[in-house]
């Protein structure tokens, strides 16, 4: 049986994979089979970590808010602050609260005073 040269289609497919692997090193950049394996692995990792990133940032924001509320004695802890915010219908997301707690603690006092005044 004669050898069939696989025209431009296979080259185009491999070139596309190679463009994804442009920042890899060593054999991961040069060998086609290794390139496909590593690119597939990189895509799996990037998808997994995009999902995990949301979880990690939420945990970071919660721990920052909790630390700020305990240090500045705004409330006893994070859960009481969030409970009172929802009870008084002052909906602030955790990202904004964490930024306020870290960058400007005076505004955290004003938020807590709003909650206490509404009581």
Swiss-Prot record:
GO BP of this protein: ribosomal large subunit assembly; translation
PROSITE patterns: RIBOSOMAL_L20
Organism of provenance: Oryza sativa subsp. japonica (Rice)
Location of the protein in the cell: Plastid, Chloroplast
Alphabetic keyword roster: Chloroplast, Plastid, Ribonucleoprotein, Ribosomal protein, RNA-binding, rRNA-binding
Cellular component terms per the entry's GO annotation: chloroplast; plastid; ribonucleoprotein complex; ribosome
Entry similarity comment: Belongs to the bacterial ribosomal protein bL20 family.
NCBIfam families found in the cross-reference section: rplT_bact
Protein name in the entry: Large ribosomal subunit protein bL20c
Any GO MF annotation of the entry: rRNA binding
HAMAP family according to UniProt: Ribosomal_bL20
Pfam families linked to this entry: Ribosomal_L20 (PF00453)
Database matches in CDD domains: Ribosomal_L20
Job description of the protein: Binds directly to 23S ribosomal RNA and is necessary for the in vitro assembly process of the 50S ribosomal subunit. It is not involved in the protein synthesizing functions of that subunit.
Main subcellular location: plastid
């Amino acid at each position: 049986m004669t050898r069939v040269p696989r025209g431009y289609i296979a080259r185009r497919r491999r070139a596309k994979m190679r463009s994804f692997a442009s920042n890899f090193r060593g054999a991961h950049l040069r060998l086609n089979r290794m390139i496909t394996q590593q690119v597939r692995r990189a895509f799996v990792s990037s998808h997994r970590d995009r999902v995990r990133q949301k979880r990690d940032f939420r945990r970071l924001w919660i721990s920052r808010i909790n630390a700020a509320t305990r240090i500045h004695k705004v409330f006893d802890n994070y859960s009481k602050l969030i409970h009172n915010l929802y009870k008084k219908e002052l909906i602030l997301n955790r990202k904004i609260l964490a930024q306020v707690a870290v960058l400007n603690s005076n505004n955290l006092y004003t938020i807590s005073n709003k909650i206490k005044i509404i009581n």
